């Protein structure tokens, strides 16, 4: 098992927030991300052609909270192509901007516990770490989904204790921007 690194680092963090029709939760999510980070933190929102006022709410929140992030961008896709295409477009954008820090991807409906982002960030003081994931705290009554996700969570944790896992929890995960190449 890996021990949590004791040394610190100040690698820049880009929070990648893919959204689609998140009007009911987007302000709560942005408030959730409004924390004091001991490293430069920017925000990239990629909207997959929302038909509600999600983008307007994001822009208004950023206008009202200009000092929360070092930099912020909102990319609006002209048509809905799904989360995977949105994330790929965002990563291509970061590549074009020569971004070389860490990327935290999080879902709009996923709340993040206090200290989680700083803890995930801390793992990267070990240069052998390429990606880390968090443990989801799901608030659902769908027992089939909960059982299914619990099984994968148990498998992922067991694999991580042995060496590494082949999949991460998509609602909150972080990786080195140079961990892999995105083909345009």
Could you tell me what each predicted segment is?
Residues 1-9, 159-160:
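N-terminal membrane-anchoring/stem segments of glycan-assembly enzymes
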Residues 12-14, 42:
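Cell-envelope/extracellular polymer assembly enzymes that use nucleotide-activated donors
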Residues 24-28, 52-61, 87, 115:
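Acidic helix N-cap motif at the loop->helix transition within catalytic regions
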Residues 31-40:
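Short, acidic, metal-binding catalytic loop of nucleotide-sugar glycosyltransferases
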Residues 47-58, 79, 110:
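A conserved acidic beta->alpha catalytic loop
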Residues 77-97:
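Glycine-rich, basic loop-to-helix element that forms the pyrophosphate-binding segment
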Residues 103:
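Short aromatic/hydrophobic "clamp" motif used to bind/position activated sugar donors
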Residues 114-146:
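Conserved donor NDP-sugar-binding/catalytic core segment of glycosyltransferases
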């Amino acid at each position: 098992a890996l021990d949590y690194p004791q040394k610190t680092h100040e690698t820049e963090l880009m929070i990648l927030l893919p959204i689609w029709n998140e009007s009911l939760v987007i302000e709560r999510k942005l408030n959730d991300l409004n924390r004091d980070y001991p490293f430069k933190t920017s925000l990239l929102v990629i909207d997959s052609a929302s038909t509600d006022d999600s983008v307007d709410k994001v822009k208004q929140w950023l206008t009202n909270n200009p000092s929360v992030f070092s930099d912020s961008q909102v990319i609006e896709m002209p048509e809905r192509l799904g989360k995977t295409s949105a994330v790929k477009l965002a990563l291509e954008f970061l590549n074009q901007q020569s971004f070389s820090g860490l990327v935290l991807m999080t879902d709009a409906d996923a709340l993040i516990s206090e200290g989680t982002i700083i803890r995930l960030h801390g793992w990267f003081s070990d240069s052998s770490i390429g990606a880390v994931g968090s443990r989801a705290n799901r608030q659902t009554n769908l027992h089939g989904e909960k059982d299914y996700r619990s099984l994968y969570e148990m498998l992922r944790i067991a694999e991580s204790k042995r060496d590494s896992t082949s999949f991460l929890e998509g609602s909150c995960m972080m990786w080195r921007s140079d961990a892999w190449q995105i083909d345009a």
